[in-house]
Amino acid sequence: AKKAGYDGVEIMGSEGYLINQFLSSHVNKRTDRWGGDIENRMRFPVEIVKAIRAKVGEKFIICFRLSMLDLVHDGNTMQEVIVVAKALEKAGVTLLNTGIGWHEARIPTIVTSVPRAAFADVIAEVKRHVTIPVIAANRVNMPETAEQLLAENQADLVQMARPFLADPDWVAKASLGQTDLINTCIGCNQAC
């Protein structure tokens, strides 16, 4: 990515993917140095970050998408998430992105019935314990919601994807104050 001219990369460490599986006692039943307590379970992502940082130098952006709320049985506690967030920061992560829930979680996280910015308190709690910027995601689909998260210091940045699929002119309309013209993402999670 660096050789191709990118400013940074994001490491997917949430939603139940491989790195998240090492982090969570939900599936990590290992009894070696890669399993057990959180210090061992976080070894895999921390080593990944350290290796990337060593290759790309200090100025290259490394964003880590961390599962801040697993929503599965035996998922990480908030205390464990904070320990991991601090360790990732120390290992060289530039930004922390928000992952909420595993794909197989029975609790909805992005559908219409979930209130906008429903997980802001979880994000803000992690933000209180690190010095690197924390990105809010999940059910942030209108400019007012994003601005509120930033104004209330619950996040440093806001990430969106589905809202831009619903309206490719979202940013232009928001910047012109035409939020009433935005084709709002309704969180149907279909074809996106």
Give, region by region, the residue ranges found by the protein language model.
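Flavin-dependent oxidoreductase catalytic cores
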Residues: 2-192
